[in-house]
Amino acid sequence: MGTTASAAQQVPSTVPSSENVQGNGSGSSNVEDRNSLSTQSFQNVSIHNKAKSIITNKVAPVVITYNCKEEFQIHDDLLKANYSVGRISETMPEHYLVQGKYFMVHDVYSKLDVLNTTSSCGAPNFRQARGGYEVYGMGQPSLNGFKQVLQKLQSNGHKECVFFCVREEPVLFLKLEDDFVPYTPRRKENLHENLHDLEKGLRAENLELAIRKELHDFAQLSGNSYYVYNDIEHFKDEPHSIIIHCEEDIHVTEEVYNRPVFLLPAYRYHRLPLPMDGAPLETQFDAFVNILRENPSLLLLHDANHPPPALLFSCQTGVGRTNLAMILGTLVLYHRKGACEKQTISQDTNVLPKQRFQVIQNFINMVPNGEAIVDEVDKAIELCSEMHDIKAALYECKKKLEGIGEGYQIQGSSTKEYFLKGTLHSLERYFYLITFNYYLHEQYPLAFALSFSKWMCTQPWIYRLQASLNLSELTLSGELITKGTRVLVLDDRFSPDVLSTLKEMNVANFRRVPKMPVYGTAQPSLKATGSVLSYLTDAKRKYSNILWVNLREDVILEANEQIFTPREPDNLEQQIAVPAASPEQLEKLEATVANHVLTSQKWLEVYLEQEKQMKMFKTCRTMQEIFNQHRSAYPGLVYRRIPIPDFCAPREQDFDMLLQSMKSMLAEDSSAAFVFNCHGGKGRTTTAMVIAVLTLWHFNSIPEITEDEIVSVPDAKYTKGEFEVVMKIVQLLPDGHKIKKEVDMALDSISETMTPMHYHLREIIICTYRQVKTAKNSKEMRLLQLRSLQYLERYIYLILFNAYLHLEKKDTWQRPFSTWMYEVASKAGVYEVLNQLGFSEFENAEEQPLCRLRYRWQQQNTNLLPFRGEFI
């Protein structure tokens, strides 16, 4: 009997997962019992290739495993043993499953061809954008159908064609009579849904090649046939057996779409996967722009009289992704050709609301020609709306979101949540189309000198806008509380007095930076505010001018001399941040809620430190009213509300407001005191105290930097904040090392005052990152990953702010920090570094979406609370 050990060196093109190997690990050599094969023994052996090599040879060779202690006889039945089988229902035959779990389903059935163009044009829903633009869209054609489409374009007079397949899912073309017909792998749970969100690094093209090899093997094991499904509505006569003699009976997408280039030299094919929902990634925009760069006839560099190539886009049905791609193509040709031929606006467009979404209006307000940029996108959407109007779909989704009740469910999930997700995805897609048109305005005349992703890093404020799509909290009033939809929760319930200052100062966690007029505290009541002000103005401290800054983003009420905040009854710990455009907007909303609670005179459900009670409030004040009451006794008191996000770096404009408030106070009195508070007096308060310390040092004098102590503890390097990404920023900045050390000095001086809290803005970064490995579940792990990155970014922003204080000191900081960041720091590449933020010493940042600005900043305004109010 012959033996082979070399088979163990072969590398399979597709390795079956271990759970699909039907073995019990007994190690028996009984060749009749397939279940006796040890899964472990074959982990590193190419069963796929081995089995294939012996199909025509019934001699059973022996394979010696790597440790040379066990041997097994492998018959040709082994291949079958390592493929999974399944069936749609008990009445249907069992057969092999693609990739161990998928059924091959006919890609497009006749009902999807709404425009009825398959027979006349070769593809379902084939159409041209209106306005004379050379932009076409279609659903998935067969091989012969695609040839017919190309003939159609030639007959329309197009000498050049650039074709984009915008599908991310694998598509295989199986031979059927004289044509090759598209099939896609689908899950049994949802045979109507294609695969999407493929694993990181897994390309559809590679998956198609792997599936083709599998299908060929399946057919060899089943008499040169394989079962596929054509009718997944009624399953009449299903499944169908399709003949496969060789791999040439199966085409992959590239073979169908790329081969015409040999017959039509002016034809080009590109695969540009676009998402089913939401906006494309920056890398996908980059890929599209790179294709445009490669086609001179699409650029202004070319003779304007020379017609541009036809742009043809295709997905499965020719609707969602194709529609998105057609709009992108139309915008490009608008910049190439100018305004379109005069068209009548469709009836549907006229019935859409005239009022813009707030995030779109905010964009218009920030861009000089913003109105025109948005109008051009609206026009492009209208010109491509024959099959699908993304604006109409957006407003329809919004209407359903606001109109549906709480209790409804879709597939076990909240219907309201389903429509909220749909509205956010649609608005994000619309927003990114507008952003892309803004990019075209700047970069098209320059032949795309900057890629889209690099350009976005020069416009970081766009990411700030995109992070605030859902502004529904701005539409709410106190009615939610008086109706019992939300409840009032005592602030102290989730704000422990770790520093034990409540007894002496009537407020939790009150502290001072050593030798500096900078104080921090938890949220005070009217009485506690009086205690702190009395303490600061007593004979020992003698402060006559005090700036008090409240850093909270949520609604705060003092009712019956206790501090309460509105919360969801099912999630009492979650603060409800209000995405206000200004402090005044938040304070106005706060006053509305307070007035509603007071005038309702209802018994309201409130949560105290331990128990739940019903209370009727005789008083209900806002923070502004509390400080107004103290102003007569303390005429030098100035109160400011500067809401900054919890856990994160303050936004650029937050630094502006903090610095401006301090500058104004110091202009009045150079020895004024500064008090900061958030909810518990920890995260945001400490951040603001660091900003205040750095600012005062620049107004007065910066202490000498002491030499670093030699510390021999685990992670000492990272405890000192010497992460690779931090050092990249340090290297970019003039005197970067000195600037970082000054920030560290400020952080260390403040942490001395809060030792019992075990909270240090720099040291918490590595502490939180280390906790990711011990997370109890995936939800906790994702939260810890986010927090560690947010803490890292916060530390970097403090370093950048100190650099700004140094570099702009000569002009007394006339240029705001936000302007400096956008005009100076962005050109130096700071936002490009922040767009790859991660712990590169431990992991690959590119594999983590949260390392990118788009996703990380989006999380600042994301919560898992039920949708309330209107989507404005």
From Swiss-Prot:
Keywords assigned by UniProt, alphabetized: Coiled coil, Cytoplasm, Lipoprotein, Myristate
Name of the molecule in the record: Paladin
Family: Belongs to the paladin family.
Region annotation (Disordered) ranges: 1-37
This protein's encoding gene: pald1
Lipidation positions, renumbered (N-myristoyl glycine): G2
Coiled coil as UniProt keyword: yes
Single GO cellular component term: cytosol
A Pfam family that the UniProt record links to this protein: PTPlike_phytase
InterPro entries to which the protein is assigned, alphabetical: Prot-tyrosine_phosphatase-like, PTP
Top-rank lineage group of the source organism: Eukaryota
Main location (coarse class): cytoplasm
Coiled-coil region(s): 186-210
Disulphides: none
SUPFAM superfamilies noted in UniProt: (Phosphotyrosine protein) phosphatases II (SSF52799)
Protein localization: Cytoplasm, Cytosol
Species in which this protein is naturally found: Xenopus tropicalis
